[in-house]
Amino acid sequence: MTDRKNGLTYADAGVDIDAGNRLVDLIKPMVRATARPGADAEIGGFGGLFDLKAAGFKDPVLVAATDGVGTKVKIAIEAGLHAGIGIDLVAMSVNDLVVQGAEPLFFLDYFACGKLDPVATAAIVAGIAEGCRDSGCALIGGETAEMPGLYTDGDYDLAGFAVGAAERGTLLPGKDIAAGDAVIGLASSGVHSNGFSLVRKIVERSGLGYDANAPFSPVMTLGGALLAPTKLYVKSCLRAIRETGAVKGLAHITGGGFTDNIPRVLPPHLGVGIDLPRLPVLPVFKWLAEQGEIAELELLRTFNCGIGMIAIVRADAVEQVSDILTEAGETVCLLGEVIEAKGEHRVVYSGHLDLAW
């Protein structure tokens, strides 16, 4: 084969295959640590494998979810804090699986950037692997795409794909949700992974940098506080579902807040009544509300406000379900009850949020 003195290489175009290979070497042990029954979590092949029988399922229904982290990525880039983004990526998909009563089985990620930094990217994958371990699913594959010209150097985006399973007949929401059922809230860890376009606008208005002390949490930088990883609710919720049989529905509170997400798990003729003074609003939301002069209803339709998961529970089992969730590490509060829907407003708020800080 003839060598061409002035011939171009892939590296000349901005794609470093060797950097990609270094990344694979760095992440292989992390990925391997996510192995579970049904998957050995070895990467390098053309596709990932999962054995449903080895996972113990008899008559499973598969449930799939995909999501990203939104513009929270921009804060991670500007703050130089990347590890938690990987946990966010997993949480956004596996939390959507558990609301349907499904156990997460495996996860794949897609990472795209302008110039691949193996060390920084490995930190993100470490977070993905941690999220997978904490939710009991195997990381069985992924794609790393270096795309100069489409992304600038330093910029990246990522997406996640999760598949879970539930035995036929056990999927949520149940068809027996009825007026009088209790509405329980599970505390969030922070802003989680939605609403960050508004968060960034508010930070810009405040004049603070992401390296400044967070006004609502002086022991942390603003960037570090805003980047608190999304809470994983998988193990606690699966335990409550399986041990009580009293969890009729779950709603993951993401974009759309309470207003848009809770109705997604309810029959058309039902709604919920939420007593806002019971909602434990985290300091970060109080600060965002003040700095952004955000109206209460806008806050409730944009952010989780301190509650990242809602459980619809049989009224006579509230204490039992709450005790199990608390034992599993959740902070739980009773927020209201299921009601007959009246008109187009299916989430009816009473009282007001406590936004004083």
Swiss-Prot record:
Per the record, GO CC terms?
cytosol
A molecular-function term among this protein's GO annotations: ATP binding
Q: Classify the source by domain of life.
A: Bacteria
- Assigned EC number: 6.3.3.1
Indicate where this protein resides in the cell.
Cytoplasm
Transcription listed as a keyword? no
Q: Keywords on this record?
A: ATP-binding, Cytoplasm, Ligase, Nucleotide-binding, Purine biosynthesis
Q: What is its main location?
A: cytoplasm
Fetch the InterPro entries from UniProt.
Answer: PurM-like_C_dom, PurM-like_C_sf, PurM-like_N, PurM-like_N_sf, PurM_cligase
Reaction(s) catalyzed by this protein?
Answer: 2-formamido-N(1)-(5-O-phospho-beta-D-ribosyl)acetamidine + ATP = 5-amino-1-(5-phospho-beta-D-ribosyl)imidazole + ADP + phosphate + H(+)
Family annotation (CDD domains)? PurM
User: What are the recorded Gene Ontology BP terms?
Assistant: 'de novo' IMP biosynthetic process; adenine biosynthetic process
Pathway assignment reads: Purine metabolism; IMP biosynthesis via de novo pathway; 5-amino-1-(5-phospho-D-ribosyl)imidazole from N(2)-formyl-N(1)-(5-phospho-D-ribosyl)glycinamide: step 2/2
What PANTHER family does the record tag this protein with?
TRIFUNCTIONAL PURINE BIOSYNTHETIC PROTEIN ADENOSINE-3, TRIFUNCTIONAL PURINE BIOSYNTHETIC PROTEIN ADENOSINE-3-RELATED
Question: What does the sequence similarity comment in the record state about its family?
Answer: Belongs to the AIR synthase family.
Q: HAMAP family in the record, alphabetically? A: AIRS
* Protein name (database record): Phosphoribosylformylglycinamidine cyclo-ligase
UniProt organism field: Rhodopseudomonas palustris (strain BisB18)
